[in-house]
């Protein structure tokens, strides 16, 4: 695979939305990653293979050259500091937004512009701290790895910062969105050394994927 391209991506929504993009570029996975237990999956193109890893690990694999190219959400890229990657293409998949949410009863009498200090549960402490610091709001951040909506319900935190798509999960747990932080989508990222050593192949891949991206 020294002259081929290794692409890192994660299971779930991003994978399902990325497969048609690759198919449109003439690259088909040889196996269904959702069904297979394999972590390295070949494609119908002998010069391309896929690594199926955790979403949060994609930037690390690409940064260190274990993968030449990867697909990662903008939330993951912003949360991890010090990444030395090219980010040539917004694939416009995995679209959602990052927001602050709180119990509906609290939101009825709340005014985000008046916040001076907040206690937030999130799996995005870096983004959260930076966002509130830019507004002059002091933060007490509790890092969680899942089920953010539970934190305000049991008194662990007053509010949460999380990704919101349909808003259904918030609603079912009695929470409402009170402030949007930023829009989120998945990006194509490229290892800097690979961009030099495999420029022709990677630039071809970028053009092929770009042609599949919905305007």
Swiss-Prot record:
It catalyses: 1-(5-phospho-beta-D-ribosyl)-ATP + diphosphate = 5-phospho-alpha-D-ribose 1-diphosphate + ATP. Its EC number is 2.4.2.17. It is found in: Cytoplasm. Keywords: Amino-acid biosynthesis, ATP-binding, Cytoplasm, Glycosyltransferase, Histidine biosynthesis, Nucleotide-binding, Transferase. One of its GO terms (cellular component) is cytoplasm. GO terms for molecular function: ATP binding; ATP phosphoribosyltransferase activity. CDD domains: PBP2_HisGs. Pathway: Amino-acid biosynthesis; L-histidine biosynthesis; L-histidine from 5-phospho-alpha-D-ribose 1-diphosphate: step 1/9. The keyword Oxidoreductase does not apply. Pfam families: HisG. InterPro entries: ATP_PRibTrfase_cat, ATP_PRibTrfase_CS, ATP_PRibTrfase_HisG, ATP_PRibTrfase_HisG_short. It is an enzyme of class 2 (transferase). GO terms for biological process: L-histidine biosynthetic process. Its main location: cytoplasm. It comes from the Bacteria. Lacks the C-terminal regulatory region which is replaced by HisZ. NCBIfam families: hisG (TIGR00070). PANTHER family: ATP PHOSPHORIBOSYLTRANSFERASE, ATP PHOSPHORIBOSYLTRANSFERASE ATP-PRTASE. Heteromultimer composed of HisG and HisZ subunits. Catalyzes the condensation of ATP and 5-phosphoribose 1-diphosphate to form N'-(5'-phosphoribosyl)-ATP (PR-ATP). Has a crucial role in the pathway because the rate of histidine biosynthesis seems to be controlled primarily by regulation of HisG enzymatic activity. This is ATP phosphoribosyltransferase. It comes from Acidithiobacillus ferrooxidans (strain ATCC 23270 / DSM 14882 / CIP 104768 / NCIMB 8455) (Ferrobacillus ferrooxidans (strain ATCC 23270)).
């Amino acid at each position: 695979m020294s002259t081929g391209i290794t692409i890192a991506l994660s299971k779930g929504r991003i994978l399902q939305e990325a497969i048609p993009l690759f198919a449109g570029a003439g690259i088909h996975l040889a196996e269904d990653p959702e069904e297979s237990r394999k972590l390295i999956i070949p494609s119908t193109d002998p010069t391309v293979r896929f690594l199926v890893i955790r979403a949060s690990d994609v930037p690390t694999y690409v940064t260190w050259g274990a993968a030449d190219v990867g697909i990662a959400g903008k939330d993951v890229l912003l949360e991890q500091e010090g990444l030395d990657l090219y980010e040539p293409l917004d694939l416009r998949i995995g679209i959602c937004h990052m927001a602050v949410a709180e119990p509906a009863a609290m939101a009825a009498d709340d005014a985000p512009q008046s916040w001076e200090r907040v206690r937030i549960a999130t799996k995005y402490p870096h983004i959260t701290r930076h966002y509130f610091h830019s507004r002059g709001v002091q933060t007490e951040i509790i890092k969680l790895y899942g089920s953010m909506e539970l934190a305000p319900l049991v008194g662990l935190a007053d509010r949460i910062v999380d990704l919101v798509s349909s808003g259904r999960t918030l609603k079912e747990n009695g929470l409402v969105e009170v402030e949007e932080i930023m829009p989120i989508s998945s990006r194509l990222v490229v290892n800097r050394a690979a961009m030099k050593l495999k420029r022709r192949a990677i630039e071809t891949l970028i053009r092929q994927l770009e042609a599949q991206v919905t305007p």
